[in-house]
């Protein structure tokens, strides 16, 4: 499949740095703002800490490293495909090729790509981050997130994914004036199972995003109202 591309972001890119474990992006106005992943990770920090305690530090590190490698490889292959570039499968593990093969019918529902692995920011929200994809999915413009997981997770566990996608939708609108219709998460497992989560209740997730931001700001500045 050949994907059509349209670029409304120009050559936008931002410098970034790490400070006290928080990734910061330098906006065009000179402000340094946190990444959306720093905010969502902070909001879910206790869940992650409880999991590490339950399975043990060594096992948690092993699982995290394995998941990170799997996700990075799958994203790299998907990005090449979406950019209409040839994938040299000798550069990837067999598992990546297997997972990509099962995800491909769902990837082929994407077209008219606005962004693939692009940095977005919002001065209004004071955040920035890197979106997997903004494109039409089954004919409707969407923020599209590619996720790998050992098994398909229940939707109730994925709130932070949808909140992060909502930020990208908000930032893209702020930067371009273009509104996305929906939030799409394509999740694929090492066993080849694929699940697509399609969220359209954007108002709910913008409210959650504000809550995430306020808690993050309160923790890092001591401000009661997150301002």
Protein language model annotation of sequence segments:
Residues 115-222:
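Mg2+/Mn2+-dependent nuclease catalytic core
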């Amino acid at each position: 499949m050949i994907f059509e591309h349209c670029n409304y972001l120009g050559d936008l890119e931002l410098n970034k740095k790490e400070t006290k474990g928080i990734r910061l992006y330098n906006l065009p106005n000179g402000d340094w703002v946190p990444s959306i992943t720093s905010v969502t990770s902070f909001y879910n920090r206790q869940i992650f800490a409880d999991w590490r305690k339950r399975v043990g530090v060594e096992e948690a590190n092993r699982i995290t490293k394995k998941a990170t490698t799997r996700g990075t490889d799958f994203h790299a292959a998907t990005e090449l495909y979406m950019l209409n570039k040839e994938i040299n499968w000798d550069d990837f593990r067999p598992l990546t090729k297997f997972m990509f093969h099962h995800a491909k019918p769902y990837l082929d529902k994407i077209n008219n790509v606005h962004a693939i692995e692009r940095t977005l920011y919002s001065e209004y929200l004071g955040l920035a981050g890197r979106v997997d994809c903004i494109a039409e999915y089954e004919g409707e413009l969407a923020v599209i997130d590619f996720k790998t997981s050992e098994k398909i997770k229940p939707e109730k566990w994925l709130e932070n994914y949808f909140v992060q996608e909502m930020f990208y939708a908000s930032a893209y609108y702020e930067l371009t004036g273009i509104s996305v219709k929906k939030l799409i998460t394509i999740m694929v497992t090492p066993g080849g199972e694929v699940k697509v989560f399609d969220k359209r209740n954007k108002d709910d997730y913008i409210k959650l995003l504000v809550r995430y931001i306020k808690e993050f700001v309160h923790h890092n500045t001591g401000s009661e109202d997150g301002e």
